[in-house]
Structure formats: structure tokens, C-alpha cells
Amino acid sequence: MNKNIFLIVAVFSLILVIPMSHAQLTIGGNAEQKLIEMKLDIDGTVSVKHVVSSSNMPVTVQLFSGTISNLVIINEKGEDMFENGANAGIAYDPQGNQSIVIFPSKQNSIIEYNLESIIPEDNLLTIQTSYAETYSIIFSDEIEMIFLNNNIIFLENKKGVSLNYGGSATIQYYSNTPKIIKEVQWEENEFDVEIITDSKIDKFNFEQTSKSISFQVNEEDKLVTIIMSEELLGGPYLIFLDDEKIKFNKTMKNENNIVLNIKPEVSGEIVIIGTTVIPEFSM
């Protein structure tokens, strides 16, 4: 009897690792995952790790969508669980998405792989992710700031972000942050205006009387991030591209500095208008 059961499991495991293009195979229940982590490096390398709890039943782990390479699955002892197909196997859905089926195990399982999902555009790297459970996105130390669904986040001493309860996200970050520092000097006061963009910037100007900052962007569809002191130019703000009002995102970097983020669809003159500005000094 035991020999027959072993034969059924062994044959089933052999079938499981064969790609199936027209059927979806789910064995047992969804796995209980202790950790779901995606790590993004400055060079665009995407590394994913799942830590799966032990179970006395077969369980299935859905992998992230995309082109997967360097897939390994080991137990807590570091033993290869793919060996002989007796402990784990791969299943494919009709769209080619991969899942890992883990057979009953008294140890936690660790799944690791790389995703070929980064889309490079000059110096800006983009990845779109989606998962049905809470997962973390960790960034290498060289990455200073990211865009999460078009919202800018300065990492500073934070390692990354967590998407609670899962969901989809568009992540963007620079492989080499392109900073332009413009100094505004007014009498004895000096203010730095920092512009982060892959676009060439010309004709930067600060006008105290009109409470505005202006500059020329020379490329279309490029993210432009402006960081400046609220003391220099306070909000609320209006931003124009060649006299046409455009959308922008605003956040605070810290207590004193605001961040404005835009993406002009065409090249032209950007004008940022505030409602408050440093007072004029008497001559």
C-alpha cells in the first residue's frame, strides 16, 4: 500500500514540473508566507524572496509575474527541494505565470529568483509589480529616492516600502540621481533650489515681485522634481507650462523644504507661482 502511494506521488511530481500552457494547476491551499520581499538594486537587478511556513498539506505559492530566472527553492537546512521533484514542483497557468507547489514539509521553505521586469529609460528605471498579499520592496543603499505610483518618497534611513494587503504598484528610481542645484541669493539670504531630472534645464530665474520661479525644460515626458525652501516661495502653488496650467504633486521633504513633482508632456517654459515669498529688503 505504501509503495503504491509513493508511486502515485512520484508520478504526479514528474507531471507537475512539465510546463502546462492550457491549464492551471493548484494543489492544496494557498501557502502561509512569513515573508514576501522584492529587492531592487541600483543597476536594475530585481531579486525576490518568499519564506513559506511548514505545512502537513501541499500548498501553492504564486510567483510574481514576469520573466523569471535563477529560480531556487531550499529548506531551512539549505537542501534543494527541487531534487527528484519529490518535495516541490512548478505549475504554469494559461498566461505562463508560474507557481510553486510545495509538498508536506516539517521545515520552512525559501524560494528565491530574479525578475527581468525593469524597463530602462535613460537614467530612470521603472518596474510594475502586482501581488495579492502584503509584500515589501527593499532598495539598495545607493538609491536615495523613489516614485511610488507617481508619489515621491525620500528613503533616507528607510530601507524600503511595504504594500499592505498587496496590490499593484509602479516603482521608478534613478540609477544615478541627476541633481541640478540653483542658488538664489537675495541680499544676505541664500537659498538652494534643487532640480532632479534627466531633462536639460536652461534659463532658471527667480522673480520676487511675481512670486515665481521659472526655467526651460528641453525634453518631453521627463519627470522633473523641484525641492526648495518654503521660506523662499510659499504655497499654495500654481504650475504652468507655456502659460497652460499643469498638474503636479506636492509633498514635504522635511519641516522647511517642499517638493513639487511634474512631468511636462512637451518641452517649454515652466513657471511655478507661489502666494508667499521672502519680504523685500529695504535699500
Regions found by a protein language model. Name each.
Residues 21-280:
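Lumenal/extracellular ectodomains and adaptor appendage modules
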Residues 9-17:
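Bacterial N-terminal signal peptides
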Residues 5-7, 278-283:
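Short, hydrophobic alpha-helical membrane anchors of single-pass surface/secreted proteins
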